């Protein structure tokens, strides 16, 4: 009988962070197996140690290919990509070896997705420190995956049931935001948001709101001119392309309306403008998904949590949500391909 559940590659993340234990907790939830076939890309010994930590009733089944998985609750299918000495790993203390391993998990997942052998990847957290120890030139998942897939433009969306936010600028100092904003970048982010909501979220006519930058949306230029000179023209240009978009709106009122389903996504000018309201609502179950990639990639919206790693107390809610979203997007994009 044909199994239509998408195969979701779950990258283990930093071995000395909370990734391994939240994977065990997530795969201990029978519901995960109703929406997908989860395949761990990581280290067999580390995952066995995490299973022991959580006292989970779970067997480990290794396979060299996604086709060899069993995909049934109570069995963790894993493609073993490293052979770390699990007994000697110190929680919160990355090494060049753990850094290289976590990069291998990511690149293997990307390659499998690009080859169509899995339908999506859901990534567990990593750190810039571990990547640097491994000699990587990249600072995080997004840059690494964009480079691996030869993708020139990507954007970060934080998504939950009540709110979705997409960022124009991401990890830059607040004092540099205004200088970095331009009409082309804002237009590209709006366009990418619209296309993703259609193709990966199944929203045929997405409603997009755009946040202003300054207090009260600049108050007709009294508190800043970015709304008049940069943001509003980008919104008008997006509208002329047939995108249902409005704004710029003062952020202090915008997010109330967005969280009450008046918009399908909000395009934000900088990191904290979007993430503060998002995490107020979706602190435990938010998902980070990368827009613009030729593959589906979702991720937890938290870090490695070195301070609580390997204590068995980490909350798996965000990973479960990321797996569910990856499965949903895989199902929607698969249907889109069939209908074309």
UniProtKB/Swiss-Prot annotation:
Belongs to the PdxA family. Its EC number is 1.1.1.262. The keyword Zinc applies. One of its GO terms (molecular function) is metal ion binding. Its main location: cytoplasm. Its cofactor is Zn(2+); Mg(2+); Co(2+). Catalyzes the NAD(P)-dependent oxidation of 4-(phosphooxy)-L-threonine (HTP) into 2-amino-3-oxo-4-(phosphooxy)butyric acid which spontaneously decarboxylates to form 3-amino-2-oxopropyl phosphate (AHAP). Pathway: Cofactor biosynthesis; pyridoxine 5'-phosphate biosynthesis; pyridoxine 5'-phosphate from D-erythrose 4-phosphate: step 4/5. Substrate binds at residues 141-142, 279, 288, 297. Binds 1 divalent metal cation per subunit. Can use ions such as Zn(2+), Mg(2+) or Co(2+). Homodimer. It comes from Desulforapulum autotrophicum (strain ATCC 43914 / DSM 3382 / VKM B-1955 / HRM2). This is 4-hydroxythreonine-4-phosphate dehydrogenase. It catalyses: 4-(phosphooxy)-L-threonine + NAD(+) = 3-amino-2-oxopropyl phosphate + CO2 + NADH. A divalent metal cation binds at residues 171, 216, 271. HAMAP family: PdxA. Keywords: Cobalt, Cytoplasm, Magnesium, Metal-binding, NAD, NADP, Oxidoreductase, Pyridoxine biosynthesis, Zinc. Pfam families: PdxA. The active site is located at the dimer interface. GO terms for cellular component: cytoplasm. It is found in: Cytoplasm. PANTHER family: 4-HYDROXYTHREONINE-4-PHOSPHATE DEHYDROGENASE, D-THREONATE 4-PHOSPHATE DEHYDROGENASE. GO terms for biological process: pyridoxal phosphate biosynthetic process; pyridoxine biosynthetic process.
